[in-house]
Design a protein with these regions (language model features):
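C-terminal motif of bacterial Sec signal peptides marking the signal peptidase cleavage site
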Residues: 15-17
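Electrostatic cytochrome c docking/interface patches
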Residues: 19-42, 131-141
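Inter-heme linker and motif-flanking segments adjacent to c-type heme-binding CXXCH motifs
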Residues: 21-23, 53-57, 75-76, 96, ...
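Gly/Gly-Pro-rich "capping" loops immediately C-terminal to redox-active cysteine motifs
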Residues: 28-34, 38-40, 51-88
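The canonical Cys-X-X-Cys-His
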Residues: 37, 43-53, 86, 102, ...
Length: 141
């Protein structure tokens, strides 16, 4: 086994160990219901601006794609990516980042928790996006 293959295997084992149940304590949404959150995302029209995994027709290109959100360091580019911040962001984005393009959709607390739970859910399975792995470990394909 090459050095690159050994490093990749160790990294994959380490990452797999960090994803107990697919949700970290940072992204666990207390009281959130992911399936209801998917439905609420449709009801609030999130797919008009965002690509949302598991939501047919959610192919908007105004805001960022929302897949693999749990693996990102920030929400809205500057806010720490944790459950309380994401819930507040969904409820009142203008309060957290005045002037943002994200509109205030008058999302209530329960709906915001459920939407956050859905966005943090592991939709694709696996170990996350390959762009998080060092390119030198992936080869030069």
């Amino acid at each position: 086994m090459s050095v690159r293959a050994r490093r990749l295997a160790l990294l994959l084992l380490a990452v797999a160990g960090c994803r107990e149940g697919g949700v970290s304590s940072r992204t666990a949404v207390a009281g959130g219901n992911a399936e209801r959150g998917r439905r609420m995302g449709v009801a609030y029209g999130c797919g008009g601006c965002h690509v949302v995994p598991g939501v047919p027709g959610a192919v908007g290109r105004v805001g960022p794609a929302l897949g693999e959100l749990a693996g990102r360091a920030y929400v809205a580019g500057t806010l720490p990516n944790d459950a309380p911040t994401l819930v507040r962001w969904i409820q009142d984005p203008q309060a957290l980042r005045p002037g943002t393009a994200m509109p205030d959709l008058d999302v209530g607390p329960r709906d915001a928790r459920d939407i956050a739970a859905y966005l943090y859910a592991d939709h694709a399975g696996g170990l996350g996006p390959p762009h998080l792995l060092p390119r030198r470990w992936l080869g030069s394909h």
